[in-house]
Amino acid sequence: MKILQVITSLHTGGAETLVVNLVPRLRAMGNTVDVCLFNGEETALMRRLRNENPGIHVWTLGHGYYNPLYIIKLARIMRHYDIVHTHNSSPQLFVAIASLFSRTRLCTTEHNTSNRKRQWKWYAPIESWMYGRYGHIICISKIAEEKLREYMGGAWTDRRSRRYSKITTVNNGVDVEAVRHATPDDVLLRAKAGRTAVVMVAGFREAKDQDTVVRALSLLGGDDFEVWFAGVGVRQTVVSEMAVSLGVADRVRFLGMRTDVPRVLKAADIIVMSSHWEGLSLSNIEGMSAGRPFIASDVNGLREVTKGYGLLFPEGDAAALAALLTRLRADAAFYQSVAESCYGRARQYDIKDTAAKYDDVYRALMEE
């Protein structure tokens, strides 16, 4: 099959990482897989994609995300492929419109349980039309599927309807063993100097809650812990200013955009994901793969993977997070038990299984 993955960009993020992880595995199954980017800016993930996939064609439409001229370009490009698979909002909509001028089969992945558009009631009919153009809609977790059906309503919730069967769940996956056996970053190992290092890998954006991690650090006192934030984004300045105001700036490290996340995870002692909402976080699964205890906010998209394996704290509850961090540092047996349980859970979300299920979806579409 000739498959085109369409996404906004290859800046670091969950959907972007999933695409880069999927491409070589789908190619190994005998498929031709190319990528189309709305914003073709050179990034670390772009370089990795090219290095791991000799001969791949990367189509770049421009440098923005919402240029309507992209629809014309997409209509021309799509004719070269059997399957076009979209990720993120603007590619979903623009490809749906472009499909009016192409017979290519369409698939999309819904990566979130919530977004701002779902608060716009007037937009729901547009999304219903858009999703109706797709032969299949993959949700990255069961809760993401439930929330999408709830939002769409109508035939999307009626088991007798053709539209109902268009939506299925394929859990996100990561290369679990690559994370497990990564070499810790030497610079970070030396820098923590006996402190317990708590790392959160996430962009500084609306859905993420680095603020609670900083507040938890301020409650711990002493000099036993430090926090590492790997990622960039519009809220980084806010979080940095909070660290200063709470008197913990000397124990918070902003690592910036990292292309060696497994090495960062292995250098840390505890891994945290503090969020307001998620789809199914790849950082969640990566964190649980590292052989370290994983702590997450008790919210949709994190709860489903973490509960019963890692540790959960109420959303925004810095005191509860601080208490869990304290116990993990003080109780070696508890620390080891949680770490082993997390790794066992992560193995249920291996990228090999994700790729095989995506391939099954594509083959089913080809038979329709």
Model-identified regions with their sequence ranges:
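A short, active-site helix/loop in glycosyltransferases that binds the activated sugar's phosphate group
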Residues: 134-166, 174, 178
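A conserved, positively charged/aromatic
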Residues: 78, 110-135, 146, 154, ...
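Acidic anion/phosphate-binding donor-loop and adjacent secondary structure
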Residues: 65, 69, 149-150, 164-190
